[in-house]
Amino acid sequence: MTIQLGIPVLRLARNNSQGPAPTSRPAGLPSKLLDRFGRQATDMRLSVTDKCNLRCTYCMPADGMQWLPKEAVMTAGEIERIVGIGVERLGVRELRITGGEPLVRPDLVEVIATLRARHPELPISMTTNGVGLDKKAEALKEAGLTRVNISLDSLHEEVFSQLTRRPFLGKVLAGVEGARAAGLGPVKINAVLMRGVNDQEAPELLEWALQRDIELRFIEQMPLDAQRGWTEHGMITAPEIHALLSAAFVLERDRRQRDGAPAERFDVRRRHAASGEASGTVLGTVGIIASVSEPFCSDCRRTRVTAEGKIMSCLFSREEFDLLGLLRSGAHDDELVRLWQDAMWVKPRAHGMDHTGLGSEEFIQPDRSMSAIGG
């Protein structure tokens, strides 16, 4: 099977035949996070730490990374101010807390409580590996966390340990149950399949999730590993994921509008072994995120702020804008607004580039790994 790693025809608000707008943001635009291609960022991904307690093979080397010094990471007060500007001045409507692993930040509960007090209606979710979540889930819920996405790539200790380089499967499973008990739902599970490692577990993972009324989302591995070991061959593509699941289940595409959501969702029915036909009952849903083979860049609504306060308009951005440095220099909120707007205005069309995709010779893997950006 050949997968074209290009960018599909973009459904943008402006006339793409004219090329992108000038790289300087024109005067008179609304006070929103707009870019040259007509997209508006309303979904903020905020990394609260670069540290992590796992060493996933598709993310970082076995010996870990050089962590940021404590003084380089945003304080709780700085986070409150930056999020406040995003929500109150720039049209941010959703906030996702990321890492590294956010649970390793000691004041995480206090950070979320402060954000909730200032923004009572803001959906605040978190992406986590789940290690230690069972001990903090209730406190996080009480502080104002809405829901969680938990990364889980295998249900087998040996495979899990191979992928994460840590024997913590039991801790992650306890974290899943803790999140469910605390009401941090809907709980979603993110899984990355690696060829020859855990790809044959796809049906088992889905069965496990369906039994717990959890939405499982399979994500194509992206070239964001610190050791730069990503290859097209090693990536399990969306069509392959669909085929792996179809041996045991019938997947029926959810026709509802995705509205910028990355996952293509499917209703799941059991496949009868004898007839191959679908059963009459929908068991739940599964999502497939084809971030490489079928990218959704044209509908992207995300703006990212790293743990040290750098704005990244895209996971693959080659440019970063130092929002925290400007804040610490004594800048007024109006100056921070302008920098953030300028940073998003030059957001590339797709995968860090304006014209081509991951299959292009122009593509350059960013210096940051996923753990240093925030998922």
Language model features by range: what are they?
Residues 3-12, 20-99, 103-123:
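Conserved alpha-helical substructure of the radical SAM core
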Residues 54, 157-158, 295, 321:
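Glycine-centered loop/turn positions within well-structured domains
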Residues 1-34, 274-284, 293-375:
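Radical SAM enzyme core and accessory elements
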Residues 76, 80-97, 101, 105-219:
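Radical SAM/AdoMet-radical enzyme domain recognition
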Residues 46, 76, 166-169, 199, ...:
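Electropositive phosphate-/nucleotide-binding environments in soluble metabolic enzymes
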Residues 63-67, 155-157, 223-226, 321:
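A short, flexible beta-alpha/helix-coil linker loop
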Residues 55, 59, 105, 158, ...:
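Residues that scaffold the ATP/ADP-binding catalytic core of kinase and kinase-like folds
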Residues 5, 10-11, 158-161, 166-286, ...:
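Radical SAM enzyme [4Fe-4S]-AdoMet core and its adjacent flexible, acidic
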